[in-house]
Amino acid sequence: MIKAFLVEDSPVIRENLVATLEELVPLKVLGYADSERSALAWLDDPQHDCDLVIVDLFLRQGSGMQVLAYLGRTGRAADRVVLTNYATADVRRQCMGLGASRVFDKSGEIDALIEHCLVLADQSSPAAPDGASA
């Protein structure tokens, strides 16, 4: 099961995204933040361990770009993806430069985000021993 952290300031989007991901993917959202400050506080806590961080770029306070930069500086192993309404070529390039593995457009790439999460879940599940059937 993927342990995820969500950085999203819209309560409606956050609620719908959590419900969708937890229904369709073996994933549990451990927490969320609606601002850069609260995201960094959560991520800075050594007891908060996650496999995936989903980041919106425009937050109630601060920027998702700064959250990505922080994750890059700390060397956290979690996969980082961006979910934004502003997925231009330039924004995608900047996010990838800050360590995002993928950038998804909220308006048309939710299915691609789900597929990405399913691939992560498949990669993180232990392989069955030789001769064992699934």
Enumerate the language-model features and the residues they cover:
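Conserved acidic carboxylate
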Residues: E8
